[in-house]
């Protein structure tokens, strides 16, 4: 039986705001998140600006120890998920864990962790690679960590569909509820890809704007 599907809660960690209200006001106000890259020295790169998330505090959403064992993309996912569950009135429960699932997509996953651990390997050898490297890196860990946080035991996986990843996740969640495989779904996407490898790679394939002189107006559809 096909069921009506509704959105009951929203959450957002974005380059123009770390919650839904701030993000929305920035969007309708035409505020750009573009600015020179601060996360690494991009002076020798073709592309030297990006839309970075600013002022994010993972400690608002995760235990500090848990956050240290999570790549930034997973931290962003947790922040948005906690907001969405609160917005839906489900932060304290009120849902059947067996009928609740999580689909969170990521195009690149924990690339920052990959970069860090590759440096460790080159400098100190394989025995110094963190045992947390793989679970921090894999793209489906964001969905896994969020599901553990809320005890969700329903469908749980990641989508990876390039720029359509988040929309793909939301569409899959819609169908999951519509066809009766779950009653509640947390869905969306997460990325933390302002990194040397990704900026260099996307830049060299000419997939990024090179209007470094005006980051705020570089996106021109």
Q: Language-model segments: which ranges?
A:
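Generic hydrophobic secondary-structure packing signal
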Residues: 19-22, 26, 73-80, 165, ...
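Acyl-thioester C-C bond-transforming condensing/cleaving domain
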Residues: 2, 18, 28-37, 86-99, ...
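Generic anion/oxyanion-binding catalytic loop in active/binding sites
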Residues: 12, 70, 159
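Structured loops at beta-to-helix junctions and adjacent beta-edge loops in soluble globular domains
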Residues: 10, 105-107
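Hydrophobic alpha-helical segments, especially transmembrane helices
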Residues: 4-5, 69-70, 179
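ACP-dependent fatty acid/polyketide chain-elongation machinery
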Residues: 1-66, 88
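A glycine- and small-residue-enriched flexible loop/hinge segment at structural boundaries
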Residues: 39-90, 113, 139-153
């Amino acid at each position: 039986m096909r069921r009506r599907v509704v959105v009951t809660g929203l959450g957002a960690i974005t380059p123009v705001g770390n919650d839904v209200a701030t993000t929305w006001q920035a969007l309708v106000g035409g505020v750009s998140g573009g600015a020179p890259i601060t996360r690494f020295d991009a002076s020798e790169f073709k592309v030297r600006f990006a839309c970075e998330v600013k002022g994010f505090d993972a400690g608002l959403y995760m235990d500090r120890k848990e956050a240290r064992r999570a790549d930034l993309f997973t931290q962003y996912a947790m922040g948005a998920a906690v907001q969405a569950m609160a917005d839906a009135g489900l932060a304290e429960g009120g849902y059947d864990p067996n009928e609740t699932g999580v689909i969170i997509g990521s195009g690149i996953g924990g690339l920052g962790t990959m970069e860090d651990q590759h440096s460790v390997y080159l400098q100190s050898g394989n025995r110094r690679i963190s045992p947390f490297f793989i679970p921090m890196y894999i793209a489906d860990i964001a969905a896994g960590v969020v599901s553990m946080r809320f005890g969700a035991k329903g469908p749980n996986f990641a989508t990876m569909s390039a720029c359509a990843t988040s929309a793909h996740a939301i569409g899959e969640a819609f169908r999951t509820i519509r066809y009766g495989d779950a009653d509640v779904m947390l869905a969306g996407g997460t990325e933390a890809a302002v990194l040397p490898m990704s900026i260099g790679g996307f830049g060299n394939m000419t997939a990024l704007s090179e209007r470094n002189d005006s980051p705020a107006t570089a996106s021109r559809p």
